[in-house]
Amino acid sequence: MNVIDELEREQIETCKHTVPEFAPGDTVLVQVWVREGGRERVQPFEGVVIAKRKRGLNSSFTLRKTSHGEGVERVFQTYSPQIESIKVKRRGDVRQAKLYHLRELSGKAARIKEKIN
């Protein structure tokens, strides 16, 4: 095995939070450590996963939410130490891997059907 792959796997195992299985279309709540001035606090960010990038230690995912009528997107590194926890709120039933078309939609048109097990 490659030395770099071994080092990346060790870094992933030392990650302080567990990463649940989630896919594009799922609504996810991410608790992120934020530094404001001299103090740190945990800030929640809840949104729909519109993209997921699987690259081992360099994996990331993009969340989109609407805040006060304005669309907000944020990219998170999956194994970042800034992330306190990741929770899946609901599963979405979509057919695409990237949901960039949601950027042009708003209101009821941007709804995602819930996956029924």
Swiss-Prot record:
<dbReference type="GO" id="GO:0022625">
    <property type="term" value="C:cytosolic large ribosomal subunit"/>
</dbReference>
<dbReference type="Pfam" id="PF01245">
    <property type="entry name" value="Ribosomal_L19"/>
</dbReference>
<protein>
    <recommendedName>
        <fullName>Large ribosomal subunit protein bL19</fullName>
    </recommendedName>
</protein>
<dbReference type="InterPro" id="IPR008991">
    <property type="entry name" value="Translation_prot_SH3-like_sf"/>
</dbReference>
<comment type="similarity">
    <text>Belongs to the bacterial ribosomal protein bL19 family.</text>
</comment>
<dbReference type="InterPro" id="IPR038657">
    <property type="entry name" value="Ribosomal_bL19_sf"/>
</dbReference>
<keyword id="KW-0687">Ribonucleoprotein</keyword>
<dbReference type="GO" id="GO:0003735">
    <property type="term" value="F:structural constituent of ribosome"/>
</dbReference>
<comment type="function">
    <text>This protein is located at the 30S-50S ribosomal subunit interface and may play a role in the structure and function of the aminoacyl-tRNA binding site.</text>
</comment>
<dbReference type="InterPro" id="IPR001857">
    <property type="entry name" value="Ribosomal_bL19"/>
</dbReference>
<dbReference type="GO" id="GO:0006412">
    <property type="term" value="P:translation"/>
</dbReference>
<keyword id="KW-0689">Ribosomal protein</keyword>
